[in-house]
Amino acid sequence: MILYIGDWFTVLAMFLLAGEASDNSPLAIAGVLAVRSFTFAPLEPITGMLADRFPRKTLMVIANVFSFVVLVAFIQSGMVESLFSVYLLAMLLVVGRATYDPAQTAYLPKVCDEDELLTANALISGGWSASMGIGAGLAGFVISQYGVETGLMIDSVTFLVAAIVISTLPHGGPDPDERRTGSPLEMFKDIFAGWGFILRRPQISRIVLAKGMWATGGGAQIFLLIIIGMEAEFADIETGAAGIGVLSM
């Protein structure tokens, strides 16, 4: 939940920065969501294969340290003043997240018994849902009171804390005898094999389709909440951060 809550600070900050750099252009603000989505989509199949070839715990630590360094570098260098830099920040943070998520998903069955796996997945899903409300509300309040830079710094700290916590966890595979080969040809064969597995099983392909439809509708909803929140005035705060945070809770 530390990461999920922290993510809202940066996501909300990027929306506000994109609006500030473009005179609150809805297209520019939507560009933040578009950059994140179009970076995730082609990248996750590749980063997912890394979790079959390299230690998952190490990948999670590296992903969080990378995101921490990126955020601190952008803050210290003042590289968040142009629309291009906001999009670049969004893209780089997605690289870290796309590396972290598959490693975390593959790590869980290695540290849980089979009868514990359902509960563990439910806790992760519940934590993600709770963090949407908690993170959005906290981010909206903090950024409206203390500014975008403070919000970005808070998220950078959550990446560092997460990396430290993960480093204390047990090894989560893959074991040396389980690791796949790392050649590019084998990696792309695995991608096509994965899609073949999905398409041959209607019950799985329906879940994948539903996930895609939910993401499309959810993205549109988030965008509308952002626009409404930026136009609303909560407690005479003109930045729109509080408005977005309250509506996203």
Listing of model-derived features with the role each one plays in the protein:
Residues M1-M249:
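Alpha-helical transmembrane-bundle signature of multi-pass membrane transport and export proteins
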